[in-house]
């Protein structure tokens, strides 16, 4: 888009928002019950969490640099860690794994593990990654910020976790 229109797309722009009506055909189809709709929604959330987990796994490996803004150190609340971006990605990885386990429990109709520290809203994934992005840009690492991390931020806006 940037090559065509010359201006970069704002980072939080969402020119396309994808969604699905799977499990929502409840206008007379007797096979689409509340349970079917609920199961489809849970399965979709789990799939989204798995896809974002794949992104975070790559970012854990890629974001090993130490230079970051003071604001980012405050955000992660750790002034001693040597690889602050990696530390944040590890936290997100843990939250995504807990989210997947929780959703598995809901799908299998058993009491899920604790719902503590799971990702429910898109902003729970967007905000930490955007803080990471801003810090990288401010520390003259725009090339890194505008690669996989920017792709992930755009996917959050386009697809989300829910």
Residue ranges, per PLM feature:
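Extended, charge-enriched "interface" segments that sit outside catalytic cores
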Residues: 63-162
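Generic signal for short, ordered secondary-structure residues
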Residues: 7, 31, 35-38, 115, ...
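Short, hydrophobic/amphipathic alpha-helical packing segments
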Residues: 2, 53-56, 133
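Conserved phosphate/anionic-ligand binding catalytic regions in large, soluble enzymes, centered on
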Residues: 16-36, 152-162
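Non-catalytic, well-ordered alpha-helical scaffold segments
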Residues: 16, 46, 50, 146-153
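Conserved NTP-handling cores and scaffolds of large molecular machines
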Residues: 5, 56, 60-63, 67
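Extended, Lys/Arg-enriched charged tracts that mediate electrostatic binding to polyanionic substrates
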Residues: 1-18
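Extended active-site and interfacial segments that coordinate phosphate-rich ligands
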Residues: 32-58
């Amino acid at each position: 888009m940037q090559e065509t229109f010359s201006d970069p797309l704002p980072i939080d722009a969402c020119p396309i928002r994808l969604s699905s009506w799977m499990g929502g055909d409840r206008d007379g189809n007797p096979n689409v019950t509340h349970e079917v709709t609920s199961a489809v929604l849970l399965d979709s959330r789990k799939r989204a969490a798995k896809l974002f987990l794949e992104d975070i796994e790559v970012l854990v490996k890629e974001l090993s640099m130490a230079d970051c803004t003071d604001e980012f150190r405050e955000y992660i609340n750790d002034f001693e860690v040597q690889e602050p971006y990696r530390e944040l990605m590890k936290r997100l990885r843990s939250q995504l794994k807990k989210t997947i386990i929780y959703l598995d429990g809901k799908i299998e109709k058993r009491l899920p593990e604790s719902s503590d520290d799971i990702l429910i809203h898109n902003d729970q994934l967007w905000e930490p990654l955007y803080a990471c992005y801003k810090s990288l840009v401010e520390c003259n690492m725009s090339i890194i910020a505008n690669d996989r991390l920017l792709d992930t931020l755009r996917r959050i806006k386009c697809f989300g976790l829910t």
